[in-house]
Amino acid sequence: PASKWGRASTSLPMLIAEELGVDISWRPILVGGIFNTVNPSVYAQRETPVPLKARYMKKDLADWTRSAGLSIKMPPTVFPVNSVKAMRGCAWLEPQGKLVAFATATFEAYWRDDQDISQVPVLTAICRTAGVDPDAFFAGIDQQPVKDQLKANTDEVMARGGFGSPTIFVDKTDMYFGNDRMP
């Protein structure tokens, strides 16, 4: 939920999957963990952006979100945001079949509504929007197996060559990076 490009890429795979009759296996990751481990240059680019590239990326994001029917407020008030609790929530909700509803509500709260998704009251409201019991959610995201699963997902995407978000695998091994790279 912390990646604007991740937000721009969520609706297209669902449409493609529906059209082709295939399933999507969503795997929550900690993009900050990936950046810290294999792609720390992201931080330097944030500190010293290339003005022409930054202007183009803003236009490109606006084009993608408009074509997907999404609204994104740029820049969000809190950026980067600590998305650990939200991503643990995605990991906890994945086996319950509620990951997509929760992730969608989280993306909208952060990118559309400019809310700080690291805050408990915001996550509580997101849970309610997604039909998730907030008390069970906060108990669930504190469980060690949930933390371990999120770390394992993050480690796995790096082991498979991933360096950011969105990273998409087709047929388990064919990797694509970026919302505009889907086959």
Which stretches of residues belong to each language-model region?
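C-terminal cap of thioredoxin/glutaredoxin-like
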Residues: 2-26, 105-183
